[in-house]
């Protein structure tokens, strides 16, 4: 018998396929209009069918955050893979085996020490790894400062002179998650673009190759007014979107394709609470919206059709219990009448990547109400 939202066990991670396809089309059309290729970051879904939908729409290659992801997607037929986390030396043998099996795996570095480790291992094994240099364009995380030309060139020469393939530069404007106006997002997108292009030009001026200029975050990808000098964009969460993205202003709640199916399992009527079987083990501990203009607690409550129920959120969560209540703190007069025992609801997540990671599989919901199980990768 074909499952539906009424027959699935709860909690379950549900993908609204219509919403997902619209999100994919929106980003792909924007990148096509800008004349750059889209290399989606599959750490959001970690699911082969989701990545296949992105590829079918025109995406080229993928970005991963673990070598386990690289293994899975390579086994499923993807060869062009960027491992976008600085390479730890103990992972080099695994990276080597992937390349020896035909995976066009790219590595990244942001230090001379890491470049030396890759070059030494590569020479020892007779493997010319393709390596990109990570650029820090917003002070958010890792990377060589966009203005630190001496360090940039030292890394580039270590790789190039060590027999490795210097493939390009990349950056990620992660601070875009802290913004919420079109003007601020557009300004950061330009800073991201300009800083990465500047680094590429510095390498080229020094006689070093730099064919790829890769930028990306979902907010800046959707906000960029121009991408001159950029060859590709990496974005990930756009495939599902989430409440953090809604607060940033790059999507509406109605665009969020991932939700957690939950069941009402009890009430605390005097407090105006309904209790659901989706606690933080289902929603994750991510409270990203707490720092934004609208706090959605542990998630926005929707009805079974995915329609937002204004004013109701998960205000709290224990391991397996979610507390459904009014966001304004007022006690709902008759919570048990509004949300009877056994009621099924869908909860939109703060952070799609974190919520997806709580589940071994997605339930892919088609327009006709049927559901298919899509496996999801777990762990490292």
Curated annotation (Swiss-Prot):
EC number: 4.3.1.27
Temperature dependence of activity: Optimum temperature is 50 degrees Celsius.
Primary enzyme class: lyase
Gene3D superfamilies assigned to the protein according to its UniProt record, in alphabetical order: Alanine racemase, D-serine dehydratase-like domain
Cofactor(s) of this protein: pyridoxal 5'-phosphate; Mn(2+); Co(2+); Ni(2+)
Name of protein: D-threo-3-hydroxyaspartate dehydratase
Gene Ontology BP annotations: D-serine catabolic process
InterPro entries reported for this sequence: Ala_racemase_N, D-amino_acid_metab_enzyme, D-ser_dehydrat-like_dom, D-ser_dehydrat-like_sf, PLP-binding_barrel
């Amino acid at each position: 018998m074909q499952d539906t939202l009424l027959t699935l066990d709860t909690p379950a991670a549900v993908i609204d396929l219509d919403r997902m396809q619209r999100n994919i089309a929106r980003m792909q059309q924007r990148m096509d209009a800008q004349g750059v290729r889209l290399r989606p970051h599959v750490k959001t879904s970690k699911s082969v069918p989701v990545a296949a939908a992105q590829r079918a729409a025109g995406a080229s290659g993928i970005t991963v955050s673990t070598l386990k992801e690289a293994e899975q997607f390579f086994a499923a037929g993807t060869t062009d893979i960027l491992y976008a986390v600085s390479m730890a030396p103990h992972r080099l043998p695994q990276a080597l085996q992937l390349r020896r099996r035909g995976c066009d795996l790219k590595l990244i570095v942001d230090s001379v020490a890491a470049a030396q480790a890759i070059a030494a291992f590569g020479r020892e094994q007779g493997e010319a790894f393709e390596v990109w240099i990570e650029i820090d364009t917003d002070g958010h995380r890792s990377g060589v400062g966009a203005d630190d030309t001496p360090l940039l060139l030292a890394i580039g020469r270590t790789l190039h002179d060590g027999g490795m393939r210097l493939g390009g530069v990349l950056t990620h404007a992660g601070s875009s998650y802290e913004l919420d106006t079109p003007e601020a997002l557009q300004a950061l997108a330009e800073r991201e673009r300009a800083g990465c292009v500047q680094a590429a030009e510095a390498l080229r001026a020094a006689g070093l190759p730099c064919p790829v200029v890769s930028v990306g975050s979902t907010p800046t990808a959707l906000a960029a007014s121009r991408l001159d000098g950029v060859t590709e964009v990496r974005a990930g969460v756009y495939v599902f979107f989430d409440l953090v993205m809604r607060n940033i202003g790059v999507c509406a709640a109605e665009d969020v394709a991932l939700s957690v199916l939950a069941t009402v399992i009890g009430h605390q009527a005097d407090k105006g609470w309904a209790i659901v079987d989706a606690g933080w083990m289902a929603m994750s501990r991510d409270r990203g919206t707490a720092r934004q203009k609208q706090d959605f607690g542990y998630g926005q409550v929707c009805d079974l059709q995915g329609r937002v129920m204004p004013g109701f959120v998960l205000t709290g969560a224990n391991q397996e219990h979610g507390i459904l209540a009014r966001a304004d703190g007022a006690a709902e007069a008759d919570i048990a009448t509004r949300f009877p025992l056994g009621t099924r609801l869908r909860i939109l997540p703060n952070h799609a990547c974190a919520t997806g990671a709580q589940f071994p599989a997605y339930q892919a919901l088609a327009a006709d109400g049927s559901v298919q199980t899509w496996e999801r990768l777990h762990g490292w």
